[in-house]
């Protein structure tokens, strides 16, 4: 139940975005599904990394509902799916770089070393396959979900510190 409560928001928000675009623009775009899938996966990665970074503090307060090993497995699985989707979607380096920079601020110590090599193949593939032609759906939906996740994380940390 805690997994659904904690990680259900990105999926619901992406479905809401897809529904809104579908009704506003007719059938939407084939790129919309790719953009939303990337958005959801990046959103999960950000949330999982935040949970891993705060695990010790949560455990000390008795609020760690999930074991750390499960969180690490979830993170590796999400990054693997993201890498595969990057191969399929020919995601752009401009999309991946801000995510890596953002994750650097959220992740602590040794877990930062786990993240970097997992993102490197996606970055290399994006450089090779990308023609650097901007895609509207990728550059609109992904930042919306990433910004919403960062806002939620900031509020969560402020609430915990009070």
Regions found by a protein language model. Name each.
Residues 1-46, 93-98, 103-138, 150-162:
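Topogenic membrane-insertion module of multi-pass membrane proteins
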Residues 40-78, 150-162:
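Solvent-exposed interhelical
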Residues 73-93:
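C-terminal halves and exits of single transmembrane alpha-helices
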Residues 1, 52-66, 79-86, 101-110:
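Short juxtamembrane and helix-loop transition motifs at transmembrane-helix boundaries
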């Amino acid at each position: 139940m805690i997994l659904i409560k904690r990680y259900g928001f990105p999926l619901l928000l992406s479905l809401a975005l897809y529904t809104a675009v579908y009704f506003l623009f007719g059938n939407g775009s084939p790129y919309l599904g790719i953009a939303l899938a990337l958005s959801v996966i990046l959103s999960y990665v950000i949330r999982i990394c935040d949970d891993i970074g705060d695990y010790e503090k949560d455990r000390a307060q008795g609020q760690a509902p999930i074991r750390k090993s499960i969180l690490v497995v979830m993170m590796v699985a999400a990054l693997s799916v993201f890498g595969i989707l990057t191969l399929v979607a020919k995601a752009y380096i401009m999309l991946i770089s801000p995510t890596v920079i953002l994750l650097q601020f959220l992740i602590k110590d040794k877990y930062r070393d786990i993240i970097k090599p997992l993102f490197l193949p996606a970055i290399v593939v994006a450089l090779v396959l990308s023609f650097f032609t901007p895609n509207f759906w990728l550059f609109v939906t992904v930042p919306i979900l990433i910004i919403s996740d960062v806002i939620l994380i900031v509020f969560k940390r402020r609430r915990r510190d009070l």
